[in-house]
Amino acid sequence: MKRYLITSDGTVIAGYGYGSPVTGYGELVFTTSMTGYLESMTDPSYVGQILVFASPTIANYELRKGVMESDRVKVSGIVTRDAHINMPAGTLGLDFDRFLRDEGIPAIDGVDTRLLVRKIRQGGVLRAYIADDPQGHSDFPDPMSENLVARAVDARGVKNIRGKGERRILFIDLGSKKTLRDMMLEHFSLIMASADSDLDAIDKYDAIFVSNGPGDPDHPSLRPVVNFLKRNIGVKPIFGICFGLQIIALAYGSKTYKMKFGHRGSNHAVTDGNRIYVTTHNHGYAVDPDTVRDFHVRERDINDGTIEMIEDGMMMAVQYHPEASPGPHDTRWFFSEMRRRTEDAAKG
């Protein structure tokens, strides 16, 4: 079945359609990860986006439910060069084509993804449709103008989860990955709270953590979270990962900006000036270095100098994903350092 990728710059690319027959729309971005396709597709940070896999071969190993980062696929569609759509079923009991059909996710195969990635790198992220009919797609609204966090979070409200640690963390869930929650529970007990919760009404916690998530960190719907963090700077230890770093930086008075094509993949090197860490990234926004105030920039991306870690006396946040999944475990020390700082603050 022929299917088309229609982009906001007027490009129309024909390919083979699989997955759901629905029309998909979103911001067109790419990942350079060569493995972890199911983890990427179920990562809530991809809400509102169509994901191009730079790796030419996708779905060449079985689908395993245990690696899913949320209950459902979160991307708006996928673009592949050579997808093994009829790969024998894994623990999900489905081949790739049937899995995407059941999830309501459209996909297009046979695309020159190398050319498409170069196009995005040179011109910046695009907006795109995946559709069976190439005609009638002239409206390309900005998905980042939506409240994507509301679509990314699987559970609303406040929930207590007992972990292996005694210290309790107020975990502000903006679209967290399962692996991240699991790693946090290895060190702490969590008070899970969605962004629309009354955060000021929650008490009896030792530190605050802000999770990853999708969209524009300066979206009006997130202003209550930013203001809550402002009120707690210097009061409670504050930690964050990925989107969480950007939210924390806004609370400190810094600004964020939209990157040309972002960082998405499991092979991004960052440095603190002494050591180099290979890390997993998934972000299309970053902190404006000209607006840094009241905190120290500890790590930067080796390739483009993007701010990748910030800290002050009671705050620490990274732009990358130390929990990885997929990706390297070079920076899992972040969780131990969180625990140490939380313990020190609790002891006064």
From Swiss-Prot:
L-glutamine binds at residues 45, 213, 215, 243, 246, 282, 284-285. Pfam families: CPSase_sm_chain, GATase. It catalyses: hydrogencarbonate + L-glutamine + 2 ATP + H2O = carbamoyl phosphate + L-glutamate + 2 ADP + phosphate + 2 H(+). One of its GO terms (molecular function) is ATP binding. Residues 168-348 form the Glutamine amidotransferase type-1 domain. It is an enzyme of class 6 (ligase). Small subunit of the glutamine-dependent carbamoyl phosphate synthetase (CPSase). CPSase catalyzes the formation of carbamoyl phosphate from the ammonia moiety of glutamine, carbonate, and phosphate donated by ATP, constituting the first step of 2 biosynthetic pathways, one leading to arginine and/or urea and the other to pyrimidine nucleotides. The small subunit (glutamine amidotransferase) binds and cleaves glutamine to supply the large subunit with the substrate ammonia. Composed of two chains; the small (or glutamine) chain promotes the hydrolysis of glutamine to ammonia, which is used by the large (or ammonia) chain to synthesize carbamoyl phosphate. Tetramer of heterodimers (alpha,beta)4. Belongs to the CarA family. NCBIfam families: CPSaseIIsmall, PRK12838.1. This is Carbamoyl phosphate synthase small chain. The gene is carA.
